[in-house]
Amino acid sequence: MALYQGAAFFMLVASCVCSTVFHREQQTWFEGVFLSSMCPVNVSAGTLYGIMFDAGSTGTRIHVYTFVQKVPDNTGQLPVLEGEIFDSVKPGLSAFVDQPKQGAETVQELLEVAKDSIPPSHWKRTPVVLKATAGLRLLPEEKAEALLFEVKEIFKKSPFLVPDDSVSIMDGSYEGILAWVTVNFLTGQLHGHNQETVGTLDLGGASTQITFLPQFEKTLEQTPRDYLTSFEMFNSTYKLYTHSYLGFGLKAARLATLGALETAGIDGYTFRSACLPRWLEAEWIFGGVKYQYGGNQEAGEVGFEPCYAEVLRVVQGKLHQPDEVQRGSFYAFSYYYDRAVDTDMIDYEKGGVLKVEDFERKAREVCDNLENFTSGSPFLCMDLSYITALLKDGFGFASSTVLQLTKKVNNIETGWALGATFHLLQSLGISH
């Protein structure tokens, strides 16, 4: 856990007031960056950059972060995070499982965004890294390695700094921890010593993560040991509850609901569900595999109740349920956010606050009107029902639990990429 104790958690320290003075013989790497909105830049400064690729199951995203570093002799001042350039492409790398060179070309396309965003004079000292998540974890190892090799070749041809470990598959728990740190840092929840933090819920295409700081000893006692991660900061020990569930992301859950998760797609066979419009006949490609799917055309039921029964089988009894989540505050993002936007429950730009029961209410509304479905995603009923089941019957949230749905905080994307970039800069000795 040395990585978590040092590398990933420098942002926790960074959330202190700007005038903080560190009394240590050796400054650890996480003492070096502050968010510019918290610590305005009023002196001459140098600029540095970091490029982080998030290779998810449904798309590849690039984050270009800009930092400002005060002049070297101004030792009382520390670098600040100035902003982020974000872009993405679809589908994800896993869709190119048998065409690795073609998959790497999508990364090349996004590298042009970095070149346009960073002055040429900084290219040689700007590190570029790609971390893949659940989409590549689900692939056979040799297939995933072939994709990563081609991406590394693209990086080597770029004008940027390419570390030895520039391309890798990230552990799911690392994903959850860094997302928790990022959200709590950006929202200012880690200021001071009261440890009043928020939990985080991340719903990707192939996996989902839940992370929070337990407040009750009972939670620690009843939680499996591999769900807890400890680290130290300011002479205090933090113990996070965090777990990543591979195969429980939104897209993987569709396959599980259809009964297609363990298959490679069967020619001529159509997977059917009560969660889909009765007349629907369609094809869907996920992870480079084509699936035929449709509704219950004749005697089969459709609507919320039969649909919920289908998605319930995917999650019931398969996830750990800490009692404490019913009383906690949580930020939810990724597909939680996207589906709430798709159904006009929240504003795309501002996000919003929802209760778990709001997802169930919207699921009932959509599913019980499948016969009138005309546009949008045919999976909307299934997705909303799955989100409801995941929250209530999977994680054990109460219907009244309030969730903050957000995509950005202080104009910075939520998720793990910011923390990973901080770690990258320090590991290369760039952040000071």
Curated annotation (Swiss-Prot):
InterPro entries: GDA1_CD39_NTPase. Its EC number is 3.6.1.6. It catalyses: a ribonucleoside 5'-diphosphate + H2O = a ribonucleoside 5'-phosphate + phosphate + H(+); GDP + H2O = GMP + phosphate + H(+); UDP + H2O = UMP + phosphate + H(+); IDP + H2O = IMP + phosphate + H(+). Glycans are attached at residues 235, 372. Pathway: Protein modification; protein glycosylation. One of its GO terms (biological process) is 'de novo' post-translational protein folding. It is an enzyme of class 3 (hydrolase). One of its GO terms (cellular component) is endoplasmic reticulum. Residues 1-24 form the signal peptide. Keywords: Calcium, Disulfide bond, Endoplasmic reticulum, Glycoprotein, Hydrolase, Magnesium, Secreted, Signal. GO terms for molecular function: ADP phosphatase activity; CDP phosphatase activity; GDP phosphatase activity; IDP phosphatase activity; UDP phosphatase activity. It comes from the Eukaryota. It is found in: Endoplasmic reticulum; Secreted. Its cofactor is Ca(2+); Mg(2+). The active site is at residue 175. N-glycosylated; high-mannose type. CDD domains: ASKHA_NBD_NTPDase5 (cd24114). The keyword Hydrolase applies. Monomer; active form. Homodimer; disulfide-linked. Homodimers are enzymatically inactive. Hydrolyzes nucleoside diphosphates with a preference for GDP, IDP and UDP compared to ADP and CDP. In the lumen of the endoplasmic reticulum, hydrolyzes UDP that acts as an end-product feedback inhibitor of the UDP-Glc:glycoprotein glucosyltransferases. UMP can be transported back by an UDP-sugar antiporter to the cytosol where it is consumed to regenerate UDP-glucose. Therefore, it positively regulates protein reglucosylation by clearing UDP from the ER lumen and by promoting the regeneration of UDP-glucose. Belongs to the GDA1/CD39 NTPase family. PANTHER family: ADENOSINE/GUANOSINE DIPHOSPHATASE, NUCLEOSIDE DIPHOSPHATE PHOSPHATASE ENTPD5. This is Ectonucleoside triphosphate diphosphohydrolase 5.
